[in-house]
Amino acid sequence: MSADSRIAAITARIVERSKPYREPYLDRVRSAATNGPHRTVLGCGNLAHGFAVCSPAEKVALAGDRVPNLGIITSYNDMLSAHQPFETYPALIREAAHEAGGVAQVAGGVPAMCDGVTQGQPGMELSLFSRDVIAMAAGIGLSHNMFDAAVYLGVCDKIVPGLAIAALTFGHLPAVFIPAGPMTTGLPNDEKAKVRQLFAEGKVGRDELLEAESKSYHGPGTCTFYGTANSNQMLMEIMGFHLPGASFINPGTPLRDALTREATKRALAITALGNEFTPAGEMIDERSIVNGVVGLHATGGSTNHTMHLVAMARAAGIVLTWQDISELSDLVPLLARVYPNGLADVNHFHAAGGMGFLIAQLLRKGLLHDDVRTVYGQGLSAYAIDVKLGENGSVKREPAPEASADPKVLATVDRPFQHTGGLKMLSGNIGKAVIKISAVKPESHVIEAPAKIFNDQAELNAAFKAGKLEGDFVAVVRFQGPKANGMPELHKLTTVLGILQDRGQKVAILTDGRMSGASGKVPAAIHVTPEAKEGGPIARIQEGDIVRIDAINGKVEVLVEDIALKTRVPAHIDLSDNEFGMGRELFAPFRQIAGAADRGGSVLFH
């Protein structure tokens, strides 16, 4: 089925806007594919260094250009639960590559930080910038020009977007993303959130809180709520970087290993040495990007992807805007209720029908482009499947079920949870912002209240502990943008403001910083641009000004006369405390040149 005419029109607009960037990008991709990799043109010393530790048979294979070599880019470390399973993947990939007549080498490793560990800590100010560092680190690994395709091992928040930027920068190479899968279900996410609120209110101690957190985050795999990490997995599948059904299979299971083997063999099959050459830069086009945005809306995915998708698209010469994302939200229904948008976790989502059911439903209404290339072949309809373990450890795929196994978790396109998507763009005299409404109750979709000004999240937490946060208000938390301090997530404020909300106060957040993909019930107009450090209007808001956040009509404004607002002197604060410690001094150049939030907040693209 062809895409809905409205989806097609938005896609066509993106195509037209992107031409000055996309066409030169494709020229570079095709030139690189023609000129390399050709290991036989490497000097003998170069090549000897490249395969020094390989077996004699592998050296013979790599000395020519007829046996494909996979470059593995891994983000393994054993602190991140989602990345710990990758420890065994290189050996499994090498074995599968050998079975298929190829070779695989670890081309390089990239850093992988856990936002759950750094939340509310100085290290969080490196989080967004780590995405671009990951892209650059992967680029260094692939720069050896020894590889015919790359497989990318990554899961968490900034890691997958960074790896995707690298994959598209090396767009002449086929790219297959291989996930680790979610951890098994532990303490329900809503119960964990309740204990956090009780701790913030002083009603339980640290021991009780740590016990609850440990029962929630308890083993290998991705955190089970639907935050940025699991939104990453959805995106990689719906954009065609994953194999069908690969995203949400638990680690350490026979099916997980079978999918990893299959992904390896598929990566070898789509190199230029075979008959299905699928370079990543040509595979991912404007239709693929739109499919990613549609999936984000249909699942109530992470707000972080309003930045990451913009940066990922730009790496492929595609110019995606917040306006595109917002207009698509008006067309795409919400089909998933996964915490923080509901009580279920991603394991429940998968059991209800998962990605296969979701894709089938969206295709049926023409809300996705089916005519795309993927690592699995031509057409997204091949992803409308249910994946199982077949005989002899193979992967078996069947058509996705027509009915959801749990309508409270996964809805049909004819009976959605809401008729529009989970994310909206806001604009007004404060600038532009993004809001996630899928987890916010309808009565909180419009908030009009006096501003309380905070220049960091510590000030707000101190005011809460001092009992100073009374009545209705909008917490304006500013100087949190890319140029100010790297644009940290302010997720810990959700607990504090959630307590006030439960007491009957109408509260909201307005910030040039970010919120976690796990953030939920408190309305938050985030990613405000221009940011306060750049003298944006958010720096002109004063204590007591009435701020209106209207998610229904897409407005964010301070109710002050335009002339009065423009003549105010923007606030300036001393940010020197944010410049040192926990590695922040290393990122001073990044803060100086970082782009605006609506352009991806990147140092790579402006």
Curated annotation (Swiss-Prot):
<keyword id="KW-0119">Carbohydrate metabolism</keyword>
<keyword id="KW-0311">Gluconate utilization</keyword>
<comment type="function">
    <text>Catalyzes the dehydration of 6-phospho-D-gluconate to 2-dehydro-3-deoxy-6-phospho-D-gluconate.</text>
</comment>
<keyword id="KW-0456">Lyase</keyword>
<keyword id="KW-0004">4Fe-4S</keyword>
<dbReference type="GO" id="GO:0009255">
    <property type="term" value="P:Entner-Doudoroff pathway through 6-phosphogluconate"/>
</dbReference>
<dbReference type="GO" id="GO:0051539">
    <property type="term" value="F:4 iron, 4 sulfur cluster binding"/>
</dbReference>
<feature type="binding site">
    <location>
        <position position="156"/>
    </location>
    <ligand>
        <name>[4Fe-4S] cluster</name>
    </ligand>
</feature>
<dbReference type="InterPro" id="IPR020558">
    <property type="entry name" value="DiOHA_6PGluconate_deHydtase_CS"/>
</dbReference>
<dbReference type="Pfam" id="PF00920">
    <property type="entry name" value="ILVD_EDD_N"/>
</dbReference>
<comment type="similarity">
    <text>Belongs to the IlvD/Edd family.</text>
</comment>
<dbReference type="Pfam" id="PF24877">
    <property type="entry name" value="ILV_EDD_C"/>
</dbReference>
<feature type="binding site">
    <location>
        <position position="223"/>
    </location>
    <ligand>
        <name>[4Fe-4S] cluster</name>
    </ligand>
</feature>
<dbReference type="InterPro" id="IPR037237">
    <property type="entry name" value="IlvD/EDD_N"/>
</dbReference>
<protein>
    <recommendedName>
        <fullName>Phosphogluconate dehydratase</fullName>
        <ecNumber>4.2.1.12</ecNumber>
    </recommendedName>
</protein>
<dbReference type="GO" id="GO:0019521">
    <property type="term" value="P:D-gluconate metabolic process"/>
</dbReference>
<keyword id="KW-0411">Iron-sulfur</keyword>
<dbReference type="GO" id="GO:0046872">
    <property type="term" value="F:metal ion binding"/>
</dbReference>
<dbReference type="GO" id="GO:0005829">
    <property type="term" value="C:cytosol"/>
</dbReference>
<dbReference type="InterPro" id="IPR000581">
    <property type="entry name" value="ILV_EDD_N"/>
</dbReference>
<keyword id="KW-0408">Iron</keyword>
<dbReference type="InterPro" id="IPR042096">
    <property type="entry name" value="Dihydro-acid_dehy_C"/>
</dbReference>
<dbReference type="InterPro" id="IPR056740">
    <property type="entry name" value="ILV_EDD_C"/>
</dbReference>
<comment type="pathway">
    <text>Carbohydrate metabolism; Entner-Doudoroff pathway.</text>
</comment>
<dbReference type="GO" id="GO:0004456">
    <property type="term" value="F:phosphogluconate dehydratase activity"/>
</dbReference>
<keyword id="KW-0479">Metal-binding</keyword>
<dbReference type="InterPro" id="IPR004786">
    <property type="entry name" value="6-phosphgluc_deHydtase"/>
</dbReference>
